């Protein structure tokens, strides 16, 4: 454990969308000489990623309430009180200079515990529509960080920081001009793959004239890659189909255009990489937050927002034809995306934490 005044506690869990920005900030804290501790739950992705990063992981027992049965709802107050007490004990032992929450079920009880312990609390919201825990923690927080403007009501506590993303994504890709080669299309469905995109893209690309058709790299997910490759073959479209993308910086650097979902981190990475996109938000995301994320890029002309319910192969093919016939349009979208990026997000979030920690 670090000497007094050098511990920081990060709260983040559940999904990569919460954990990866938190890890970026953890590395920045460490670079400034702080020891980072992590508060999570036993079921989230943090159980794998945080120890891999060499950080101390502390666990509390808490889960979400949406969609639970009556018995779980009746138990909820007792479960939450227990989780707050667990978090308060951990905070009391660590004595961090500040606590920062990035979302996930752990953030609610952890944030309350921070307030009870008198430790400054900072929250960071990755999505354009704030999650329940972060909305409830605003009154308890010393600072509120939002990735996208307008997520929270304006106030003295609020800072628009952007999402912390990997610094290598901001490097300019060395590509030949579009007019001198075929365009390159990157299709991403997340680690599990997005089956609607896996079905849609082969059909849509078959309707793009062969002389205009781009090179295709399609990340289809572990269980969907073989059948997706078959669909491309049946459609007469050449494509490289893979279950995962191991090097996202390389994939972004290769691409001229991306078709994907609109998770908060993905949207921020597209801006960082300066990539135009066609965003198909996950239709059943909580509070429809992916649509709100997509609007951040679409409103400024850096992306096309294409709702899944109204986007078929014909509509997607029409949009692809439109931009592939106008390389300068893609270039303009790319410049707009890069303008919307927040390259200093990680250092800004850490600056805010240390500002409230040390006055």
Curated annotation (Swiss-Prot):
Positions of transmembrane segments: none
Uppermost EC category: transferase
Keyword presence, Cell cycle: yes
GO CC annotations, alphabetized: plasma membrane
InterPro entries documented for this protein: GlcNAc_MurG, Glyco_trans_28_C, GlycoTrans_28_N
GO biological process terms on file: carbohydrate metabolic process; cell division; cell wall organization; lipid glycosylation; peptidoglycan biosynthetic process; regulation of cell shape
Coiled coil regions in record: none
Protein name (database record): UDP-N-acetylglucosamine--N-acetylmuramyl-(pentapeptide) pyrophosphoryl-undecaprenol N-acetylglucosamine transferase
Protein source organism: Pseudomonas putida (strain W619)
Gene this chain is encoded by: murG
């Amino acid at each position: 454990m670090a000497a007094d005044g050098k511990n920081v506690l990060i709260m983040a869990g559940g999904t990569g969308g919460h954990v990866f920005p938190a890890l970026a900030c953890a590395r920045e804290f460490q670079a400034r000489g702080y020891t980072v501790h992590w508060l999570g739950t036993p079921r989230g992705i943090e159980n794998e990623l945080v120890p891999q990063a060499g950080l101390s992981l502390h666990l509390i027992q808490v889960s979400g309430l949406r969609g639970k049965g009556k018995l779980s709802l009746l138990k909820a107050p007792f479960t939450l009180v227990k989780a707050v007490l667990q978090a308060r004990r951990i905070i009391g032992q660590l004595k961090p200079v500040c606590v920062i929450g990035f979302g996930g079920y752990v953030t609610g009880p952890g944030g309350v515990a921070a307030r009870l312990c008198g430790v400054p609390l900072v929250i960071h919201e990755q999505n354009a529509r704030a999650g329940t825990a972060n909305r409830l923690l605003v009154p308890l927080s010393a600072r509120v960080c939002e990735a996208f403007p307008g997520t929270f009501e304006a106030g003295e506590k609020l800072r628009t920081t952007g999402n912390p993303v990997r610094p290598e994504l901001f490097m300019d890709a060395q590509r030949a001009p579009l007019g001198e080669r075929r365009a390159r299309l990157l299709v991403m469905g997340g680690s599990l793959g997005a089956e609607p995109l896996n079905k849609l893209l082969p059909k849509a690309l078959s309707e793009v004239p062969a002389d205009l058709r781009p090179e295709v790299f399609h990340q289809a997910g572990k269980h969907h890659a073989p059948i997706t490759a078959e669909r491309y073959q049946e459609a007469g479209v050449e494509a490289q189909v893979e279950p995962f993308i191991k090097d996202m910086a390389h994939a972004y650097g290769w691409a001229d255009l991306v078709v994907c979902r609109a998770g908060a981190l993905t949207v921020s990475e597209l801006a960082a990489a300066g990539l135009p996109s066609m965003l198909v938000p996950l239709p059943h995301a909580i509070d429809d937050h992916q649509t709100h994320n997509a609007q951040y890029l679409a409103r400024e002309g850096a992306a096309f927002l294409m709702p899944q319910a109204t986007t078929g192969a014909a509509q997607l093919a029409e949009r692809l034809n439109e931009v592939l016939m106008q390389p300068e349009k893609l270039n303009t979208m790319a410049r707009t995306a890069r303008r919307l990026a927040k390259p200093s997000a990680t250092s800004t979030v850490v600056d805010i934490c240390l500002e409230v920690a040390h006055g």
